[in-house]
Amino acid sequence: MEKEDNRILLLEKGKRKLIQIVFGRTGIIIVSLIVQILFLFAGFRYLEGFLPYFWGGSSLLSAAVVLFLFGNDDNPTIKLTWFFILAILPVFGLILYIYIKTDLGHRLMIRRYNDILAQTEDLAPCADACPSEELPEGLRNLATYLSSCGFPCYRNTEAEYFPLGDDAFDVMLDELQKAEHFIFLEYFIVKEGYMWGRVLEILKEKVNAGVEVRVMYDGTCAVALLPYNYPKKLQKLGIACKMFAPLRPFVSTHYNYRDHRKIMVIDGKVGFTGGINLSDEYINLSSRYGHWKDTAIALRGDAVRSLTLMFLQMWDVSSLHFAPESYRQYLDIAQPPREKTPGYVIPYGDSPLDRDLVGEMVYLDIINRANRYVHIMTPYLIMDNEMVTALTYAARRGVEVQLILPHVPDKEIAFSLAHTYYRRLLENGVQIYEYEPGFVHAKVFVSDDRKAVVGTINLDYRSLYHHFECGTYLYEAPEIANIERDFQQTLTHCVRADYELLKNDPFLRKLIGPAMRIIAPLL
């Protein structure tokens, strides 16, 4: 029986890997490479007399594309990646570039998203949002920038930090039980198991009690985690459900425009975000990668309004009908009286559909304004030159820059890529630690005991450029002390990375890392 279960598990794993390849850019690149090899072979075999014209035409085409790339405003690192692909695949590299840049499969999504934002951008502020002129000098510039992107700064909000998904889950269940009007869930991953089962039990109870419940999860879940018709199953239970951007072979790229956000909103009064999804590994009931270190944050008060608005906007991106006039009933919520809470809170989102790199700008602002320390937890380290330069410059001007990453990787390629950045960071005084008990999935920045971010945004190209993300920025809030305390506690379970660690890396890791770094911006 056990052998049969293992065989089924291996088949499912193989099926999932195959589907990911078919849906992803990897599949496109492999097919392009095979076709080009066949094309070149045919050229050599049957068109020997025309080869000079072929090479001449290919060279002219490549030169034209290179000139076009020089003229556009893409990130320079991404441009270099395309130069490399075009050098190897001069003809089909162009086809791949056009396929990804025109993105025909997502044109409707892009138009709809921009239309929704245009019609709802004035809904973000509330009466208690803070005017920029009243903000402390250390917050004013960043708050002004985020406000221009649709994310106002709030007071009258209590933040509660959770150093583990296990801790957050109990509170999430308690708050779900208190729901009286509506529950909104938006998650990158929903997977059947104990965690989702407990949540679903409460959702069914609340639906029967007349509470409106909406669930949205990313389309990648349908690859191997949930049945493709799972939304219909939930709808039969009275739960409104949408799958964001369902995957379609060669129409949608596997990595583009994924909804990587994690948002739970209850009655517009309590909101959760952070690194945890609705799957058992996030509360350490599954241990494929050792102990799962993740974090979350709960907001109670006015700032929940921004999380609610972000959810409603993304929900309508996947809807056939859009009714912005209905938003008010979920946004204009009378908050219960509470003691005045010091500090400021800015929930914010990031989108791959505009030119505002909100997630990266927030991180860079923290790093560049740090005076004493910047402490970071991130599962992945696949950065552009701007981020590397900011980290190294901060360390060289005397700021303590410490990074905590996993010691047990969930993706070998990502882990190998992270190690390619270690040497430059170490040479410039950045301290790197790896969490020895297992995998760090937390996305946390904390600096100078004054500012912190807890959210979904990794230090990699996917999060900073290709995904929908969200985070919560805290300034002079009491909970920042608990975030820093958790960082220091986590350090006690880490091994410090040094040149010896890099020297002892397996040969394959040393080979894979530099090779994959060439195309890292597209991964």
Predicted regions: what is each one?
Residues 380-402, 406, 411:
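Helical hairpin unit composed of two closely spaced alpha helices linked by a short loop
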Residues 188, 380, 414:
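Glycine- and other small-residue-rich loops at beta-strand/loop junctions that grip anionic moieties
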Residues 360, 367, 388, 401, ...:
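A general structural signal for well-ordered alpha-helical packing
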Residues 399-459:
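C-terminal structural cap/anchor segments
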